[in-house]
Amino acid sequence: MAAKSRKKLVTLILLILLAGCANQLPPGGGEVDKIPPEVVDVYPPDETINFDDDYIEIEFSEYVDKRSFQEALFISPFIEGGLDFSWTSSTVTIEFKEKLKKDITYTVNVGSDVVDLNNKNRMANSYSFTFSTGNKIDRRMITGRVYAEKPEGVLIYAYRLGTETDTLLKAKPDYVSQTGNTGDYELKGLSESNYRIFAVLDKYRDLIYDLDQDLIGIPCKDISLIADDTLFTNMNFKLFKADTTAPRFLKGIMTDKKHILVTLTEEIDKRLLKPSNYLLFDSTTNEKSQVQYVYQKYGKPAELIFVPKDKLNIDNSVYLIADVLKDTLENKYQNDFIHLTISDRPDTSAINVIATEPKQNSSIDFVDPKIIIYFDDGFEKNDIQKHITFTDTLGNEVPFKINFDDDATLVVSPLKDLKADKDYIIKFNLNRFIDSEGNKGDSLYQFKFSTISGLDFTGVSGNIGNFDNELNPVLVLESYNRKGLQYQKKITNENFEFDRIEAGKYFLWYYSDTDSNFQYDFGWPQPLKYSERFSVYGDTLKLKPRWTVTDVQFNLK
């Protein structure tokens, strides 16, 4: 009996142990694992020479997602024939289907897209090692950084320069690396050659730049790694979308008999928000009619609202025609048109204010302010200014002018600077704002705001190292967390100063304004146009109210 009991006990213990081995799950409760995986060992060791095996091995600090690893593995130069992968625990063996080339330095790059198995933590940085099938390691290297909102995971393409330089991006690169979470990258083990480097946010990870899908960073120059030139640093990139597609109409539907809602493929140039660029064509009667108002739908820049001047017949076939549709990159499409779904639903809604910039009861700068008021419909603009008052809270009038971004957007600008630390009111009666159907409001609208104190501003000053006026340098102070807030100025000597700056976190950078248009040029991929050279100050500047940061030393690279 005792022997049988012991056998049952041993069997039970073995079953428990086997179950534990077969189902290795993290214990319940406790802190969530946030530790990124790391490469802890490789075969062959970094910088091995005379390598003649047909496989390499990479060991991680924990189990990783196999698919993420395979998509993040790049071996340069490209290995013909493909690879086979086999896993043992947290170690992967990569076998080469064809023999490696003789006297070649290979670089293995494990990109930062690798994630662990349980919590999908990404590698903090890419990892690379080199080995050679010959008796020496090519030690040439290129380093830099990609500056983007999300800089991790960007691929760095390196091409040896030959005769077909304008078709490089149609082929896979000779060498590949990937940025870590800071945007830094290294291209190691490069052979002696001239190189052209691109940064590509490769959506499909196929190592071919897709103009319609991928963001790209263009180099400011090509790189020569010949003879004693073995290292090039600070090949930095800014990413952008090389858009070559003109905007088009997608859909047009009348929400009532006086409003046509049109969806486009992208936002158009605001200079085309004018009725004269459009017309309505009734193909049933072969008659044309005019657009009375056109404006952008608030918060949806790719949607426009058109107000027809004449009534459209619900039984007829009607088209909206644009003389030209153009985006901000000057991509244009002539004579686009779209068939409309007609409605005879009455328009009885009174016009209203739907938003303002700045917001109601907020504070703005007293120097050259602009107040933008968004309405939900187009309106008659003749003599509208005489129905608007602009005063301080004591009733003192402020001289002002008005203009219109489109037929439903009013911009109010004082003719001189306002006073600091003071309250102001813009008033108008909505019964003076009349839409195309004669609908009007019946209430008094008041927009209240205040100006900031001049004491709340901050500033920064310092010195430029390696200053060269022939580079036509422009210095930019750009907000770290407020999109669109930046200050820039052309610098003509080694000293610089920014004053009247809103407090906050900023990064400081410069670009060489070679075309003198006071705007950074990202370049162009095909045919190649180099980007403008730029450099970024290493530290984030924390600018506090009423305090100027001085003695910033910015060395241009």
Across the structure, where does each feature detected by a protein language model lie?
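Acidic, low-complexity Ser/Thr/Gly/Pro-rich repeat segments typical of extracellular/periplasmic
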Residues: C21-G189, N194-V200, D212-I218, M235, ...
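Structured interaction patches on ligand/partner-binding surfaces of diverse proteins
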Residues: N125, D202-F240, D344-R345, S443, ...
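Short regulatory "switch" loops immediately downstream of catalytic or recognition motifs
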Residues: M1, R160-E164, L201-R205, S512-S516
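Bacterial Sec-dependent N-terminal signal peptides
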Residues: M1-P37, F496, V552-K557
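Phosphate/pyrophosphate-binding loops and the adjoining catalytic core of nucleotide-dependent enzymes
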Residues: N466
